[in-house]
Design a protein with these regions (language model features):
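Amphipathic, small/basic residue-rich leader segments at the start of a protein or domain
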Residues: 1-108, 129, 434-495, 504, ...
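Glycine-rich flavin
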Residues: 48-180, 197-198, 325, 388, ...
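Gly/Pro-rich turn-and-neighbor structural signature
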Residues: 123-131, 138, 143-147, 154-159, ...
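A short core secondary-structure module
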Residues: 172-216
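Glycine-rich beta->alpha junctions and the first turn(s) of the following alpha-helix
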Residues: 223-311, 419-515
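Generic structural signal for well-ordered, non-transmembrane alpha-helical segments
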Residues: 274-277, 301-314, 336, 340-351, ...
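Extended amphipathic alpha-helical segments with heptad-repeat/coiled-coil character used for oligomerization
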Residues: 320-416
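C-terminal structured domain segments
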Residues: 504-562
């Protein structure tokens, strides 16, 4: 059964009440963190880069965040927290990630990743105690097998053998973020030696259960990126865990991982784009410093192109994060697609921006230009490296044949509120998140967008180009549909088959195109730039080139319009995302 929760109205300002509150908190946090380029700011980029160089957390900034009760952002509103929707959480966290990815993970977001299983399947007591812990400034961390991200940091495994009173936990993991600082640990442990969907269970360990002779704390591990985050290890040897520490049913660990990681994947992509925004500002600074006239024409394509890509990334992440509230049983494939596409786009974007920054990109301690090198190091450690691709493919590939046979070109479009910023959406409820089936609302949206734009084809100008691009992506979806219908039955296709991997590549880029079109159509006209098709045309053209599909020539003035907006946002101190918020200066 498809779940579409009831929608309520908006405030007089045109924004939902939850959204207005989130905007206020994000603006307050941005102001508290202050001008990132001020060398005297203890929370500015110079101070954060210095802490990173020392491989130390930025203590002053962590204290500042503690004073904002940031932990409340990770607690559902029904338990006294501020977690209303995932898209609004991303908005609140962006001021932190705009300055330092390691700070965003090390201080805050890891607690949400750890406690997602508790919000999804915990007992009332587990949920209440966890909420009280986070609301009181405590932290949680997560210990799991590589099923989470397929990241090299997450390869060790824990086992938990059944005992009359619960479990005996064994295993070692050398690289765990906040292993020493966390007040609770959520462990994904193998409880069944057989391979299969019921192999793992989730255990909740508090500090009292952790501090015992059967637990050994391992030394801190140095990482190439996120150097200010504290990674260390834990080893359990016959550690007793009571039965009431299990979260959910026995063998429910894999299902809980698949359900909760769709929030994690989408949220990471929604906040890390803010860090890339900082690098884009650095590149525009490099291209404009010392020039009285306009930016040199040779920099228009990379700068405007990266800006369009960031808007595409934000569109994709925002749509999926909103879907977690509006269509919670249908968002799992789109969540994997966003995690598949956004890291690749960001890596390519950083390479393009490096050409603009030139030698300035090597000024690693410079607040104006040092963000590039740090983000290049941080992204892989944050789970946004090449290693994370396989876990997304493992979600997408098994669904493709079923989507081709039963969903594509057959399913109704999603509610328009999915794409309308300011619409009131249901609260995020982890208990409603699905992990299989449910159709493909993004493909349906793409087909609908193309149909509405069809009458503009051949008329010339940007709207005609947008219509041509939309139809081009529908053509790609139709071709993909035919190929996916020929896939072998589920379980016989292998992720090591390059042809299968290419199908997930193509599908994920089509989802990105659908998000761009949906967000463009959902504009209410209050932002003239976003209501104009120029940014969407440029974003779709770049996505189409990655798909090697026929792409029309950019209409006259398209690149210039996007470039003009980028320079305007740089000079007026505004973010390069869909919100275009005022940044601290």
């Amino acid at each position: 059964m498809t779940i579409i929760a009831d929608l309520t109205g908006t405030t007089a300002t045109g924004h939902s009440s939850w959204e207005s509150d989130a905007r206020t908190r994000a603006s307050r946090l941005e102001a508290l963190l202050g001008d990132p380029y001020d060398p005297a700011n203890p929370h500015g980029l110079r101070a954060l880069f210095a802490a990173d160089a020392r491989s130390a957390p930025p203590a002053a900034t962590e204290d500042l965040l503690a004073g904002t009760d940031l932990g409340a952002e990770f607690v559902p509103v029904e338990y006294g927290g501020r977690l209303s929707r995932a898209d609004l959480l991303a908005r609140v966290l962006r001021p932190v990630f705009r300055r330092d990815v390691a700070l965003g993970f090390g201080y805050g977001i890891t607690s949400l990743f750890a406690t997602g299983a508790i919000w999804a399947a915990g007992t009332p007591t587990q949920r209440r105690r966890t909420a009280d812990l986070l609301l009181g400034g405590g932290r949680a961390t997560i210990l799991h097998h590589e099923l989470a991200h397929s990241n090299a940091i997450l390869r060790d495994e824990f086992t938990a053998g059944a005992t009359p009173g619960g479990y005996r936990l064994n295993g070692r993991k050398d690289v765990i973020i906040n292993a020493e600082r966390a007040d609770v640990q959520v462990v994904y442990a193998r409880t069944d030696p057989a391979r299969g969907p019921l192999s793992h269970s989730v255990l909740l360990l508090d500090r009292a259960r952790r501090d015992s002779p059967s637990v050994r704390h391992l030394p801190r591990v140095t990482t190439s990126g996120m150097r200010g985050a504290l990674f260390s290890g834990l080893e359990f040897t016959g550690h007793p865990v009571p039965g009431d520490a299990r979260v959910g049913g026995p063998g429910e660990g894999v299902a809980l991982a698949l359900r909760t990681f769709q929030v994690n994947r989408s949220l990471i992509c929604g906040v890390v784009t803010a860090a890339a925004d900082t690098v884009l500002h650095s590149a525009v600074r490099a291209a404009t410093t010392g020039r009285r006239g306009p930016v040199a024409r040779r920099w228009h394509k990379p700068l405007a192109g990266v800006f369009a890509d960031l808007l595409a990334c934000d569109s994709m992440a925002t749509v999926v994060l909103r879907a977690l509230s509006l269509l919670p049983d249908r968002a799992h494939v789109a969540a994997a697609a966003v995690k598949y596409v956004v890291p690749d786009l960001l890596r390519e974007n950083l390479e393009e921006l490096a050409t603009v920054l030139g030698a300035r990109g090597y000024e690693h301690d410079s607040p104006q230009y040092g963000a590039l090198g740090k983000l290049v190091r941080d992204l892989p450690v944050a789970g946004l490296g090449h290693a994370g691709t396989a876990s997304c493919q493992s979600v997408i590939v098994p669904q493709l044949r079923g989507l081709a046979e039963h969903s594509w070109f057959q399913e109704a479009e999603p509610p328009p509120e999915l794409f309308r910023q300011g619409s009131e959406l249901p609260l995020l409820d982890y208990r409603l998140l699905g992990l299989a089936g449910g159709g493909d609302f993004m493909a349906a949206s793409l087909v609908g967008s193309a149909a509405r734009l069809a009458s503009y084809r051949g008329l010339g100008g940007q709207i005609a180009a947008l219509a041509e691009l939309a139809e081009g992506f529908v053509t790609e979806l139709r071709a993909l549909c035919e190929e996916c219908r020929r896939l072998p039955a589920y379980g016989t296709a292998t992720l090591t088959d390059p042809a299968v991997c290419v199908l997930s590549d193509r599908y994920s880029l089509i989802v990105a195109a659908a998000a761009v079109l949906g967000m463009w159509e959902g504009q209410d006209g209050r932002d003239p730039f976003l209501a104009n098709p120029a940014w969407a045309v440029l974003a779709l053209s770049r996505l189409g080139e990655r798909l090697a599909m026929p792409v029309p020539e950019l209409p006259d003035g398209c690149l210039a319009q996007v470039m003009e907006e980028l320079v305007r946002r740089f000079r007026t101190g505004r973010s390069c995302d869909l919100d275009g918020i005022a940044l601290a200066q």
